[in-house]
């Protein structure tokens, strides 16, 4: 182990404690390969200790007055704002995305804390003073208990902040299993929450992999699981946790289609598609994966997309004006290369080859923006979630065909349309099978105050993340009917 590189600790019961396991994994900077830290691959015993701490803390936290919980969240929001630049830099270091994108991610996370700080309003019930003569009835919200969260590498700030601030604001306690690929930001979030006055045991962090995940899914004292990650794992999480009697929300894979109509403003469409396809190295559930070009606009659209992709600066996300950083690991880079080779083999036309960019030949896990034209729905690159800076272009003649292509995918996280025609927008809105829709913009981004998630194989569960769906997920209701 490299001298001077720290091994991260778990956060259990308000204390930083070493894992019972001696096994660790390196956390490299994806842009350089430099090891930033080592993360413990914790055991079921570590997880059990965290759940026990959360269960004990729930006894008092669930009874803490809601306004006091809100004041702690307000203080937490202030601390996050004060440390905004530090947090953004940490995201770039361990994830690789550009500093500008990381800065925006911190904003999204802070917005989630701001929403959660409205707990006194969010936790309000309802009353009807007279359901019959002399009888009144009311609904009251209560926390559900210990909640488990399992988060991915691609948004180490935003996704955890979808989960634990709102769960905690509602009176629950929380055990977070962050991605072992980006664990450092999670620890910093816990430090700042403690500084804000959060009592010990309300938030716990256990680093690790399969043992910790399975422990959360199976532990009888964990009442709910929130998950964001790949489709196969999300389906497993949903089925396993549900089989153990837990409430589950699992946000999973995507293959988002962007439909470009003949009347579209091409300047806007190209700008938005480039940002959506290649921002965060394509490693996001709302990335534009497929462009469906309608009618005779296709040739010019492809030409403009390639020209714009050629202007993208690739490199270390901490460098000024860098737009496209590395993918998360060398193995993911090779997986992307394999998909590019497969796309060529299956007959798609490679109009921009990201393997040839200069940055790909140096240190770090870089792959340049890659664009395929004349992709068809029987090709693997159309079917699979590649999760990398690879864009496929499908050509069709009508909006009906474009909608048919998009709806054919088993994924249904999001879709966008570029048009100036309100009739096109209405048809798109009503007929597309997806949860997050955009018009003349590339990423219909999650907002703290509205529900966020997809349909079909992009989501398992009933209640989505964020907004009042999130409040519903983290609370249960009691009805009181009284005669006086």
From Swiss-Prot:
NAD(+) binds at residues 153, 177, 180-181, 230, 252, 385. One of its GO terms (molecular function) is methylmalonate-semialdehyde dehydrogenase (acylating, NAD) activity. Its EC number is 1.2.1.27. Keywords: NAD, Oxidoreductase. The keyword RNA-binding does not apply. It holds the Pfam family Aldedh. Gene3D superfamilies: Aldehyde Dehydrogenase, Chain A, domain 1, Aldehyde Dehydrogenase, Chain A, domain 2. The active site is at 285 (nucleophile). InterPro entries: Ald_DH/histidinol_DH, Ald_DH_C, Ald_DH_CS_CYS, Ald_DH_N, Aldehyde_DH_dom, MeMal-semiAld_DH, MSDH_GmP_bac. It catalyses: 3-oxopropanoate + NAD(+) + CoA + H2O = hydrogencarbonate + acetyl-CoA + NADH + H(+); 2-methyl-3-oxopropanoate + NAD(+) + CoA + H2O = propanoyl-CoA + hydrogencarbonate + NADH + H(+). Pathway: Polyol metabolism; myo-inositol degradation into acetyl-CoA; acetyl-CoA from myo-inositol: step 7/7. GO terms for biological process: inositol catabolic process; thymine catabolic process; valine catabolic process. Belongs to the aldehyde dehydrogenase family. IolA subfamily. Catalyzes the oxidation of malonate semialdehyde (MSA) and methylmalonate semialdehyde (MMSA) into acetyl-CoA and propanoyl-CoA, respectively. Is involved in a myo-inositol catabolic pathway. Bicarbonate, and not CO2, is the end-product of the enzymatic reaction. Homotetramer. This is Malonate-semialdehyde dehydrogenase 1. It comes from Geobacillus thermodenitrificans (strain NG80-2). The lineage of its organism: Bacteria, Bacillati, Bacillota, Bacilli, Bacillales. The gene is iolA1.
